[in-house]
């Protein structure tokens, strides 16, 4: 899920969650090695969301794209190896590629792929225009660039030949690394390719939940997930794992360095020698444990009728973020991450919580009454939010107008000054492009050129340029071409980088062609703003009556009665949607067939009487996932039909096809008040599942064996090296004793599950290098092991941290908490040292795990459970941590902690009514024990001491008590 601007917003509001990755440079052979200690701290399990690697490697934005698919695969190998060298997992590596998605996700996939096809078409037309413009100027363009077709990124969809080849390439690369890299000797690699249903990141989460269900699971496992989607942060929180990091590119580090059409033409003309080598993008860590600390401070709410539990509060916070944007539902009209919509919802949540009897969510299930109270609080502020957004937009537009006017005035002054200075005989020209030498057709300087004034040059440039052309009508033909296509180019102005934008600053004295370019560039800049103003004026959300106007404009309602009926239906489906998303994040996909059947969301004020809509709660039927070709037919436009088997293409392009209406060539994009075209809403028809499946399944008998194989949903595979502890057991039982399956537990290697014999794997065979380009050696199958892998049976996930965890050391100081509570220097963390100023002090940030690497040696892969580990400590082992023994013992004696199926409450009342925070226990007299680490964990909202009880603090809170505002 990509929630726009979420990562930037989080990193600004919670600055300490981000730190740069320390990357060792391999300057010489034998330099950086995988088996060496990790300078970023050790990691047990690494999870790769491979689509975050495949996309930038196959169609990069900042460098020349690969010419062939084999080049893409080699780039993927190189990129993945770089990621692994940064993370260096020691136990498990899971590689997950997006498989067939739930129906709810296909709406967004369909919109993205239709837009991608349209953008590719417009970019090809723009390249054609650019080439002809340059030829009219006398440039010689390499024939290789003319009519060149760009690689179709829509091929990165399950079921295409590209994805089949990608899976085979990944299997080879893993086998090669296991057989040749000493650092991979004990690594267990799971590959879940595009034939395994499910989105990549959610397949990773399913794996984590399955491992947590194993009684031998180590609750101090250090997890890391790589990917570009912002929802990985939510997924990390949803695991309730205390040691979790997200690894990602710093996408904002070089966002202005685009590989433009100018670069593309220059590269073709020079055979690839002129384009500068791409600088490596830096990477970032996002520390989920630090985000948990921030949320503990921000979400604490006094005066509640039930105990505050951090894990439940975090689940509610994740749920609140769904309303601001997700891949399955449109966000509420009043909420946007860029406008601090999440902060608005958190305020509503904190106001609602004291009057509720429970949290809004529990293990991914919704309390509809709590949802209704939450929405009523938001509805109370909704009209004010629209007014404030409109006022802010007006101020922004006025500021932009003033800034543009100032820039125009400055440019005018420069032109006047430049013209005056250029007339002087002893002065160098300030504008070299205006005083450029003029050549005749033989390449000689134009006679009398040195005597021409600046004005003469400008007036005669167009005539002299046209004289260089053999065809006197070429300029007129080009003008007609541009006039006919310029309106199409404007649609994707914000996605396609061009060089003609510089011409928008030219003067009216320049040539006719340059005036056309300037006009085009100006329209590309102004039209989205005009669309935005038009869309805003249609509904006028800041004026009374916006609710009725909204349903009339967006849902085409004709009467008040129809509005009410539509409103209830939209709310019903939207509540189903947020219930579906919550379960999807916490328990796995609740239904493969459910989807939201509207393009727009309701208002917060429309969420009324929810229990009447769902008297028995929200229910789902699991259903079955689509087959790969069925998803391709659901999400691809006709322009990408070449990725499908030939038998299906006629269904997408033949006017007589029974489902031709699913594949419009032209479709409306509703900007919906947004500025950038990618933010617009493509108004595509929704797929009728029954009609689609009936049409597609009629063609199955015409498929070739290879195509039938690509259209089959399959299972994950496990790879290990001969050095793995389970290698001998697996090989003997599956291939010598011919057992059907082998079950293995977590304690031996840090992984549990079942394996089955893979029919295509021969232990005595050879894995040949599958690419035609590049060279890598063939791999003997005896140097690695491969089998079908099943996750262990997963129990219902619980919103809790498992017993036996060792909490990370706190990263936030009192000043950090005050900054968050009082919003000091909000979103200005680039001051005083730049982006990472808050994490540069080593004393302020722990970058080697919760308490240093040594803490895990005695605890990792423990036998006998947590009680055995406590006994180990009490016998005098590990003297460096004797000061912590009493804390561990008091933790183990706590009565409220149950088994791993119960909630690990973050706080509860004792019999004397005193509050117990962060698991710090009381003795029998209700007083703090001497071993309590209370002072280490206290927050700014709870100022307790040994003689002050919780009720006194609550009374202070009721009277408006807050700690004194810090002086800055």
Curated annotation (Swiss-Prot):
Ranges of biased composition (kind: Basic and acidic residues): 521-538
Start and end residues of each stretch annotated as Disordered: 498-538, 873-968
GO annotations of cellular component type: Las1 complex; nucleus; RNA polymerase II termination complex
Entry EC number(s): 3.1.13.-
Coiled coil (UniProt feature): 113-140, 387-416
Coiled coil recorded as keyword: yes
Transmembrane segments: none
Gene3D superfamilies: 1.25.40.1050, 3.40.50.12390
Gene Ontology biological process terms from the UniProt entry: cleavage in ITS2 between 5.8S rRNA and LSU-rRNA of tricistronic rRNA transcript (SSU-rRNA, 5.8S rRNA, LSU-rRNA); mRNA splicing, via spliceosome; NAD-cap decapping; negative regulation of transcription elongation by RNA polymerase II; nuclear mRNA surveillance; nuclear polyadenylation-dependent rRNA catabolic process; nuclear-transcribed mRNA catabolic process; positive regulation of termination of RNA polymerase II transcription
Domain of life: Eukaryota
Disulphide bonds in the chain: none
Pfam families per UniProt: XRN_M, XRN_N
The family this protein is said to belong to: Belongs to the 5'-3' exonuclease family. XRN2/RAT1 subfamily.
Reported function: Possesses 5'->3' exoribonuclease activity. Required for the processing of nuclear mRNA and rRNA precursors. May promote the termination of transcription by RNA polymerase II. Essential for vegetative cell growth and chromosome segregation.
Subunit structure: Interacts with RAI1; the interaction is direct, stabilizes RAT1 protein structure and may stimulate its exoribonuclease activity. The interaction also stimulates RAI1 pyrophosphohydrolase activity, probably by recruiting it to mRNA substrates.
PANTHER family hit by this protein: 5'-3' EXORIBONUCLEASE 2 (PTHR12341:SF41), 5'->3' EXORIBONUCLEASE (PTHR12341)
Name of the protein in question: 5'-3' exoribonuclease 2
Classification lineage: Eukaryota, Fungi, Dikarya, Ascomycota, Saccharomycotina
């Amino acid at each position: 899920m990509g929630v726009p601007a979420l990562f930037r917003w989080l990193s600004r509001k919670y600055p300490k969650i981000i730190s740069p990755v320390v990357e060792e440079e391999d300057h010489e052979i034998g330099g950086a090695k995988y088996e060496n200690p990790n300078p970023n701290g050790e990691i047990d399990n690494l999870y790769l969301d491979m689509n975050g690697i495949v996309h930038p490697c196959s169609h990069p934005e900042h460098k020349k794209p690969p010419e062939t698919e084999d080049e893409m695969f080699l780039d993927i190998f190189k990129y993945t190896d770089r990621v692994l060298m940064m993370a260096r997992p020691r136990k498990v590596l899971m590689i997950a590629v997006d498989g067939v998605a739930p129906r709810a996700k296909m709406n967004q996939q369909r919109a993205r792929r239709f837009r991608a096809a349209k953008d590719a078409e417009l970019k090809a037309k723009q390249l054609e225009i650019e080439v002809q413009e340059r030829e009219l100027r006398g440039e010689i363009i390499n024939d290789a660039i003319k009519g060149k077709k760009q690689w179709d990124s829509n091929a990165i969809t399950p079921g295409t030949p590209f994805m089949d080849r990608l899976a085979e390439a990944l299997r080879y690369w893993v086998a090669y690394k296991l057989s040749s890299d000493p650092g991979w000797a004990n690594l267990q690699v799971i590959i879940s390719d595009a034939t395994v249903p499910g989105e990549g990141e959610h397949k990773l989460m399913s794996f984590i939940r399955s491992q947590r269900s194993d009684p031998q699971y180590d609750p101090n496992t250090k997890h890391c997930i790589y990917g570009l989607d912002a929802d990985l942060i939510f997924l990390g929180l949803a695991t309730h794992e205390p040691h979790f990091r997200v690894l990602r590119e710093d996408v904002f580090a070089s966002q202005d360095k685009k590989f433009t059409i100018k670069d593309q033409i220059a590269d073709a003309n020079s055979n690839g020698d002129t384009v500068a080598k791409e600088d490596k993008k830096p990477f970032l860590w996002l520390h989920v444990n630090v985000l948990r600390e921030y949320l503990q401070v921000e979400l604490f709410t006094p005066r509640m009728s039930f105990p505050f539990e951090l894990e439940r509060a975090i689940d509610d916070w994740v749920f609140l973020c769904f309303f601001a944007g997700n891949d399955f539902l449109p966000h509420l009209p009043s909420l946007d991450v860029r406008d601090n919509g999440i902060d608005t919802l958190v305020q509503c949540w904190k106001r609602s919580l004291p009057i509720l009897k429970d949290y809004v969510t529990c293990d991914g299930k919704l309390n509809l009454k709590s949802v209704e109270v939450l929405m009523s609080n938001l509805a109370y502020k909704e009209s004010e939010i629209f007014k404030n957004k409109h006022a802010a937009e007006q101020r922004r537009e006025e500021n932009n107008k003033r800034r543009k006017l100032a820039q125009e005035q400055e440019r005018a002054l420069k032109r006047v000054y430049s013209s005056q200075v250029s007339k002087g005989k002893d002065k160098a020209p300030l504008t070299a492009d205006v005083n450029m030498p003029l050549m005749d057709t033989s390449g000689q300087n134009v006679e009398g050129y040195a005597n021409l004034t600046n004005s003469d040059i400008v007036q005669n440039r167009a005539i002299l340029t046209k004289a260089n052309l053999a065809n006197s009508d070429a300029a007129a033909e080009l003008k007609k071409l541009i006039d006919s296509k310029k309106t199409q180019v404007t649609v994707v102005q914000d996605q396609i980088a061009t060089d003609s934008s510089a011409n928008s600053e030219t003067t009216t004295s320049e040539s006719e062609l340059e005036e056309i370019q300037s006009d085009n560039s100006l329209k590309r800049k102004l039209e989205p703003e005009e669309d935005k103003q038009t869309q805003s004026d249609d509904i006028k959300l800041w004026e009374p009556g916006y609710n009725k106007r909204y349903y009339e404009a967006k849902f085409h309602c004709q009467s008040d009665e129809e509005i009410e009926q539509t409103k209830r239906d939209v709310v019903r489906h939207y509540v189903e949607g947020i219930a579906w998303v919550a379960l999807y994040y916490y328990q796995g996909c609740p239904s493969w067939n459910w989807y939201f059947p509207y393009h727009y969301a309701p208002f917060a004020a429309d969420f009324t009487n929810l229990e009447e809509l769902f008297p028995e709660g929200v229910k789902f039927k699991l259903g079955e996932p689509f087959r790969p070709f069925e998803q391709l037919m659901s999400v691809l436009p006709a322009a990408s039909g070449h990725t499908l088997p030939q038998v299906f293409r006629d269904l997408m392009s033949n006017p007589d096809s029974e489902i031709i209406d699913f594949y419009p060539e032209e479709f409306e994009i509703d900007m919906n008040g947004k500025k950038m075209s990618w933010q617009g809403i493509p108004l595509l028809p929704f797929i009728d599942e029954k009609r689609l499946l009936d049409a597609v399944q009629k063609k199955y008998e015409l498929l070739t064996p290879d195509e039938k194989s690509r259209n089959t949903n399959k299972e994950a595979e496990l790879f290990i090296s001969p050095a793995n502890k389970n290698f001998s057991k697996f090989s003997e039982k599956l291939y010598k004793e011919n057992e059907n399956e082998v079950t293995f537990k977590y304690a031996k290697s840090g992984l549990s599950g079942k394996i089955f014999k893979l029919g295509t794997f021969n232990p005595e065979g050879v894995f040949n290098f599958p690419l035609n380009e590049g060279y890598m050696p063939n791999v003997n199958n005896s140097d690695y092991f491969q089998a079908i892998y099943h996750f262990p049976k997963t129990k219902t996930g619980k919103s809790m941290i498992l017993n036996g965890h060792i909490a990370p050391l706190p990263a936030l100081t009192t000043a950090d908490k005050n900054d968050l509570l009082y919003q000091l220097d909000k979103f200005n963390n680039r001051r005083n040292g730049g982006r990472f100023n808050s994490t540069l002090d080593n004393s302020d940030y722990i970058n080697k795990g919760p308490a240093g690497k040594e803490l895990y040696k005695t605890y990792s892969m423990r036998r006998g459970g947590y009680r055995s580990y406590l006994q180990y400590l009490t016998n005098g082992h590990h003297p460096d941590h004797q000061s912590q023994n009493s804390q561990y013992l008091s933790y183990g004696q706590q009565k409220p902690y149950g088994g791993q199926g119960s909630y690990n409450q973050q706080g509860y009342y004792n019999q004397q009514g005193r509050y117990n925070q962060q698991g710090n226990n009381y003795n029998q007299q209700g007083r703090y024990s001497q071993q309590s680490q209370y002072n280490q964990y206290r927050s700014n909202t709870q100022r307790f001491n040994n003689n002050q009880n919780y009720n006194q603090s609550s009374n202070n809170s009721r009277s408006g008590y807050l700690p004194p505002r810090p002086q800055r």
